[in-house]
Amino acid sequence: MSVLTSIRKSLVPIHREGYPFIAIAVVIAIGLLSVSTFFGMLAVGLAIWTALFFRDPQRVTPLREGLVVAPADGRISQIGLALPPRELGLSEVPLLRISIFMNVFNVHVNRAPVTGRIEKIAYKPGLFLNAELDKASEDNERNGLIIHGPNGVVGVVQIAGLIARRIVSFVHEGETIGAGERFGLIRFGSRVDVYLPVGTRVLVSEGQLTVAGETILADYDAAPTRDIAFRVS
C-alpha cells in the first residue's frame, strides 16, 4: 500500500475537465495503432500531450496581506495602463494591467491573485484573435471576475486565444476565494489579465515567466514585512 501511495503522490494530478479529451485521444490512439504504427504513435503522443495540458499540480502560495500572486502560468506579455472590460463595471479610468500569456505547454488552471469575495462574474462572447495582441483584451471571448479583498477590488479576466475556444469557470458570485485557489481554466492557449489600482508596486517585468499561485506580481504594501505564511493547494 505504501508503494502505491508513493507512486500516486509522485504523479502530477490531471484536472477533471481534461478527462473527456484524454479519453477521446486514447481511443483514437488505440484505433490507429491497429492499422498503422506510425500514425498510431503520433496519436499516442497527442494523448500524452493532452494529459499534460490538463495537469493540475499543487502550488505553494504566499499569504501575506497585500500580495498579488500570478493567476496563470506563462509569460508576462504586457504591463501598463488600460481600461478594464466595460461589462465588469470596474472603472471608467485606466487601471494598472498585468497580462500573462499562456502557450499550449503551460498549465492552464487559473488561480485567484488575492483573497476576497467574488463580487461579479461577467462572460462576453467574442473573437479568437492571437491572445498576445493588445486588442485581444477588447475583441476576444473573455470571462471576468471582480474580487473584493482587504486592499480593495481586483479584476481578473480570462481571455481566449487563437486555439482556445472554451473558458471554464469553477466559481460563483458571492463566494469567498483564497489567494492561489483555483477559479477556472482555459482550454488550449490563452491569456489572463489582472487589473490593479494605479500606484500598486509591481514586482515583475515584461518577459518574466510566472507560476500560478506562487509568483508575486505586485504588493499593495509600500514597506512590506518579512513575515509570510504559505499554503499548499
UniProtKB/Swiss-Prot annotation:
Site location (Cleavage (non-hydrolytic)): 189-190
Compartment list: Cell membrane
Coiled-coil spans in chain: none
Record's keyword terms, sorted: Cell membrane, Decarboxylase, Lipid biosynthesis, Lipid metabolism, Lyase, Membrane, Phospholipid biosynthesis, Phospholipid metabolism, Pyruvate, Zymogen
Any Pfam family hit: PS_Dcarbxylase
Membrane topology label: Peripheral membrane protein
EC annotation from Swiss-Prot or TrEMBL: 4.1.1.65
Pyruvic acid (Ser) sites (modified residues): 190
Binding note for cofactor: Binds 1 pyruvoyl group covalently per subunit.
Assembly and binders: Heterodimer of a large membrane-associated beta subunit and a small pyruvoyl-containing alpha subunit.
Function recorded in the entry: Catalyzes the formation of phosphatidylethanolamine (PtdEtn) from phosphatidylserine (PtdSer).
Protein name: Phosphatidylserine decarboxylase proenzyme
Lineage: Bacteria, Pseudomonadati, Pseudomonadota, Alphaproteobacteria, Hyphomicrobiales
